[in-house]
Structure formats: C-alpha cells, structure tokens
A protein has these predicted regions:
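Small/aliphatic-rich secondary-structure junction motif
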Residues: 2-60, 159-205, 224-227, 231, ...
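Glycine-rich, Arg-bearing micro-motifs that act as flexible, cationic patches
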Residues: 113-136, 158, 254-280
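Short beta-strand elements of ligand-binding domains
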Residues: 115-118, 145-151, 287-289
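Short, structured interface segments
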Residues: 134-153
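Structured core of small recognition/catalytic domains
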Residues: 188-257, 265-278, 284
Length: 290
C-alpha cells in the first residue's frame, strides 16, 4: 500500500533463506535512491503435495499457525537486514497466505516497482526466487518488475545500464525507465536494437539497417534533455535480441526491457524476448509494462 504521504513503495518478495538477500539489498538501495518506502512481503501457499502415504494433511488452522510462526521470524530477520543496510528508509511488512506470484501481483497495484530474486531453490519450498514466480509476475504486474539473479552479479567500470529497443510503445516505456535508473546511479546507458537480416535474403539489407537506426534514434530522441547527465550510447547490433541483450548484460548494472503484460497466459503475453533475457541475463532485469 502507499505510504501516508502517497508515496508508492518499492515492494520486495522476501526469500525464506536468510543467505539469499540480493533482491532485498537491491530493493533497499533502490528505495533509498528514490526516497521511497520499502515494503517487505512474504507469502506461502498451503502445501498440496509431498505427504507420505496415509499421512494426514494439516488443517487450515494448523497451517496458518505454522505460516505465522515461521513468517514472522523470516520478516523480522529481513527487516533487520534492510534497516542495517539503509537506516533512513521507511520499512513495512506483509505476511500472506497464498501463492507468492499472485500475492505480489496484488501488491504491485500500489507499488512503484516490485523486486524478486531468480535463484533456483528446492521445489519443496514456496519461494519468491523461482521462475514460477518471476514469469507470471512480470506478465501480469501493472508496474515495473525487477528480477535479481543469484549469485551476485559483479560489474566492471565504467558503470552502465542496457535497454532493448524495437520501436514499439513497450520499448519506449523501457527507455524512459532506463534513463531514470542510469541517472540515479550516475551511470551511462547503452540503447541496443538487435537486427536480424532476412533469412530469405529478399530484403535490401542496407535499407533495413538504415530503418533500424532511424527507429533507434527516434526512440531515444528527447530523453537526453530530461537526463542530460546520462552518457548515451546507441547502436544497432546484428543478432537475435535475446543473444544480443544477454551478451550486453554481462557487465551491466541492469537490463531494461518492455513487456506487454497485464493479460492472459504467461507465455503468450510476456513475449519470447522478455522470457529469454529473464532466463539468461547476467545482471538484474527490469521489465516495464505499458
């Protein structure tokens, strides 16, 4: 929920494993940079499997007691971590019974952005750090979603962000946020248009390449006046978008891509490029809905 003064928080899904704090650290740092409150969310759905033959399932009341006992401890530890890292950030918590992806989707309605991890943990846990959370959340959330990889991503200097451009309204929204993120960190920005020549060889490749450059230039035009402090590099790169963006992410602070989002089935709406970079990027990935 928004704070009393109307500021929408940075929401982060809290992993039950205290050794996995990269998403929480990223969210706390982002809240501090933006002057926003931080909301820590932990959720678990009641287990539906994993019981031995003849073993009775717990009642909802029993499961609720377990959830609150463990969940309160998980959130207390997460709050201590966040407050020690960014003491001036206002922190709130939420403990919920339900599937993490859908709990976070509800939280996203009043958030500036939502942050989750992407490590692959045991499937016997309900967790925020799995593709089963990241993919449906990025497909349905009405706000930007940040997926932070485990283990920690190490960047090289000079620092830069990467944004994928394809001329669509989705990539235009991604460019806007990418400029913001770069400006907040004093980083440069690389805007990339991935170009694949026609497999049939029937197109004028020089004309097609010129068109790609035109679209890229028009997409980034005007943003430099809003963020003149951001050093911008833009280029058209030959290759599949997922491969181009994944390669560019290797030493980046973050990768920003647009997504259709907020609709039906995950695989149909998230898009192959967004899904591909979520699986393969080396750095935090920010998906931006329109």
């Amino acid at each position: 929920m928004a704070s009393a003064d109307g500021r929408r928080p940075v929401v982060v899904g809290v992993d039950p494993d205290p050794s996995k704090r990269l998403a929480l650290a990223w969210a706390a740092d982002e809240a501090d940079r933006r002057g926003l409150p931080l909301r820590l969310v932990h959720a678990q759905g009641m287990p539906t499997g994993g019981y031995r033959s003849g073993e009775a399932r717990p009642s909802w009341e029993e499961w609720n007691r377990v959830l609150h006992g463990a969940g309160d401890r998980i959130l207390e530890e997460a709050v201590a971590f966040a407050e020690s890292r960014r003491p001036t950030v206002e922190v709130s918590t939420s403990l919920a019974e339900g599937e993490p992806a859908w709990v976070l989707r509800e939280e996203a309605g009043n958030a500036s952005l939502v942050v989750v991890g992407s490590g692959h943990l045991s499937t016997r846990r309900e967790m925020f750090a799995s593709a089963s959370v990241a993919l449906p959340l990025t497909a349905h959330a009405p706000c930007p979603v940040v997926v932070v990889p485990e283990p920690e991503h190490v960047t090289e200097q000079p620092a830069y962000f990467v944004v994928g451009v394809d001329g669509s309204p989705h990539s235009a929204a991604a460019v806007d946020l990418a400029f913001e993120e770069a400006a907040l960190r004093g980083a440069a920005l690389r805007a990339l248009y991935a170009w694949r020549p026609s497999l049939l060889g029937v197109l004028d490749e020089d004309a097609a390449l010129s068109e790609c450059r035109r679209v890229l230039s028009e997409t980034v035009a005007g943003r430099t006046s809003t963020h003149p402090e951001v050093e911008l590099h833009h280029e058209v790169v030959r290759g599949h978008p997922v491969q181009v963006l994944t390669a560019a992410s290797e030493h980046a602070l973050g990768l920003v891509v647009g997504t259709r989002g907020r609709g039906g089935f995950t695989g149909m709406l998230l898009g192959s490029v967004s899904q591909g970079v979520l699986h393969h990027a080396h750095c935090p990935v920010v998906t931006v809905p329109v």
